[in-house]
Amino acid sequence: MPPAKISIRDLNFYYGDFKALKNINIDIPEKKVTAFIGPSGCGKSTLLRTFNRMYDLYPSMHAEGQIILDGSNILAKDMDVNLLRARVGMVFQKPTPFPMSIYDNVAFGVRLYEKLSKAEMDNRVEWALKKAALWLEVKDKLRASGLSLSGGQQQRLCIARGVATKPEVLLLDEPTSALDPISTGAIEELITDLKNDYTIAIVTHNMQQAARVSDYTAYMYLGDMVEMGETDQIFTNPAQKATEDYITGRYG
């Protein structure tokens, strides 16, 4: 396995008294795509949200253990969470463009963390939209509302917004589940391109998608990490019978 970008050690996560993640120990390799699969409620989206501490917004939720990003424990009390979220971008299940222009959607996060001149911001917005394979479709209407775009375009706009702050890690929580097959294919191609520059973790219910886009796959069940390995191995020769049962449709 390549060097780890994120190392998770003895991670437990709680919703109040409910233990949603149980003693997770895995490494997320750098500049690869790692997919998390498993039935609804298995903890895969919860795990993804620990990587940028989204749960901090909810007082009843807390994590224990360590999540090491480039040598620093992001669960430490003195971690600058705003800076963390600049380093670890996130794209959600449904496209979430802000009710503002396409340009301002992309510039929004950058303005929080950097002081750029107008020319520098123009260049950053163009760069991010090109990264998200959206520039050619919107370059002549940057002042139009982000809400005016199609669903697939909106999701690519959200990816552009996510990469505009130049994060090191990109979290994708079922990024194509609300999209049509053509838009899904475009996002999957984009994911393959983006891994050249980013460490990507994706949650998906679509096992065919996991097989297509990921280098590594982790199977979770009821808050446990059942198995993680190279995607080809997980799908053709899993070590655990529970993984095989899920992948072959015998689960449940």
From Swiss-Prot:
<comment type="function">
    <text>Part of the ABC transporter complex PstSACB involved in phosphate import. Responsible for energy coupling to the transport system.</text>
</comment>
<keyword id="KW-0472">Membrane</keyword>
<dbReference type="InterPro" id="IPR017871">
    <property type="entry name" value="ABC_transporter-like_CS"/>
</dbReference>
<keyword id="KW-0592">Phosphate transport</keyword>
<keyword id="KW-0547">Nucleotide-binding</keyword>
<protein>
    <recommendedName>
        <fullName>Phosphate import ATP-binding protein PstB</fullName>
        <ecNumber>7.3.2.1</ecNumber>
    </recommendedName>
</protein>
<feature type="binding site">
    <location>
        <begin position="38"/>
        <end position="45"/>
    </location>
    <ligand>
        <name>ATP</name>
    </ligand>
</feature>
<dbReference type="GO" id="GO:0015415">
    <property type="term" value="F:ATPase-coupled phosphate ion transmembrane transporter activity"/>
</dbReference>
<keyword id="KW-1003">Cell membrane</keyword>
<keyword id="KW-0997">Cell inner membrane</keyword>
<dbReference type="InterPro" id="IPR027417">
    <property type="entry name" value="P-loop_NTPase"/>
</dbReference>
<dbReference type="InterPro" id="IPR003593">
    <property type="entry name" value="AAA+_ATPase"/>
</dbReference>
<dbReference type="GO" id="GO:0035435">
    <property type="term" value="P:phosphate ion transmembrane transport"/>
</dbReference>
<dbReference type="GO" id="GO:0005886">
    <property type="term" value="C:plasma membrane"/>
</dbReference>
<dbReference type="GO" id="GO:0005524">
    <property type="term" value="F:ATP binding"/>
</dbReference>
<dbReference type="InterPro" id="IPR005670">
    <property type="entry name" value="PstB-like"/>
</dbReference>
<comment type="subunit">
    <text>The complex is composed of two ATP-binding proteins (PstB), two transmembrane proteins (PstC and PstA) and a solute-binding protein (PstS).</text>
</comment>
<dbReference type="Pfam" id="PF00005">
    <property type="entry name" value="ABC_tran"/>
</dbReference>
<dbReference type="InterPro" id="IPR003439">
    <property type="entry name" value="ABC_transporter-like_ATP-bd"/>
</dbReference>
<keyword id="KW-1278">Translocase</keyword>
<keyword id="KW-0813">Transport</keyword>
<keyword id="KW-0067">ATP-binding</keyword>
<comment type="similarity">
    <text>Belongs to the ABC transporter superfamily. Phosphate importer (TC 3.A.1.7) family.</text>
</comment>
<feature type="domain" description="ABC transporter">
    <location>
        <begin position="6"/>
        <end position="247"/>
    </location>
</feature>
<dbReference type="GO" id="GO:0016887">
    <property type="term" value="F:ATP hydrolysis activity"/>
</dbReference>
